[in-house]
Regions:
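Conserved beta-strand-loop-alpha-helix hinge in the C-terminal portion
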Residues: 206-232
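Conserved ABC ATPase signature
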Residues: 126-130, 134
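Conserved ABC transporter NBD signature motif
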Residues: 61-73
Length: 238
């Protein structure tokens, strides 16, 4: 089992010459081989926590450690942001290869990853021919192309319409089942969290609470147990 172990984490920002503490004395384990959702209101620190896990954000004190069963601490991360960040002058195929300086990604690799996100026939298209949902799928394929151990995703579907989001949630679940890659996914949407997650980490007022869901994805969020879970999470987020 792969996981991130966070010990005694403190994160402080300086604002108007004052120290503002976002996290204090946080101890947490986050699975790196499930779909783990980090859930909370805007400004609660979801993205900051994701950036800390990715090594993009310095911590004020404490430790963040990655462990797996083989005691191998080397790992690769794939990042997917809210904006797809595709280069408009490059085709889908070339966007996926944009960081492939050693030409390790073959045409068959690109076909395979685009097939995973249901875009196999779109590799010659340019971003201006893609919908928002299609652009997000390309961003996911691009992240997968570099064979990461873990995908970190920062509210990648939040700007999309309901139906596109539902389709992409299903795509994400299929990717997890087919590749067995861990996914850490940030959202503020409770329904989305329950639908896709194995674990949900709720952040509220600097406090963390983890819920584990045993049902396979996608969940039927209208089941009584999930309606009760939704109520409990809403109370935490008040």
């Amino acid at each position: 089992m792969s996981k991130f172990i966070i010990k005694n984490l403190e994160k402080t920002f300086i604002n108007d010459n004052k120290n503002n503490t976002l996290f204090r004395d946080i101890n947490l384990e986050i699975s790196a081989d499930k779909i783990t959702v980090i859930l909370g209101k805007s400004g609660c620190g979801k993205t900051t926590l994701l950036r800390i896990i990715a090594g993009l954000e310095k911590i004020s004190s404490g430790t963040v450690e990655y462990l797996d069963d083989e005691k191998n601490k080397d790992y690769k991360i794939g990042l997917v942001f809210q904006e797809s960040r595709l280069m408009p002058w490059l085709s889908v195929e070339d966007n996926i290869k944009i960081h492939d300086t050693k030409n390790k990604i073959s045409t068959s690799d690109i076909d395979r990853f685009l097939d995973l996100v249901s875009l196999k026939d779109c590799k010659k298209l340019f971003p201006n021919a893609l919908s928002g949902g299609m652009s997000n799928r390309v961003a996911i394929a691009r992240a997968l192309a570099y064979n990461p151990d873990i995908l970190l995703m920062d509210e990648p579907f939040s700007a999309l319409d309901y139906f596109t989001r539902k389709n992409l949630q299903q795509t994400l679940i299929e990717i997890f089942k087919n590749t067995k890659k861990g996914i850490i996914f940030v959202t503020h949407d409770i329904d989305e969290a329950i639908t896709i997650a194995n674990d949900i980490i709720v952040i509220s007022n600097g406090n963390f609470k983890t819920f584990t869901i045993k049902d396979p994805q996608p969940k039927d969020i209208d089941k009584l147990e999930f309606l009760e879970l939704k109520k409990e999470i809403k109370k935490l987020l008040k």
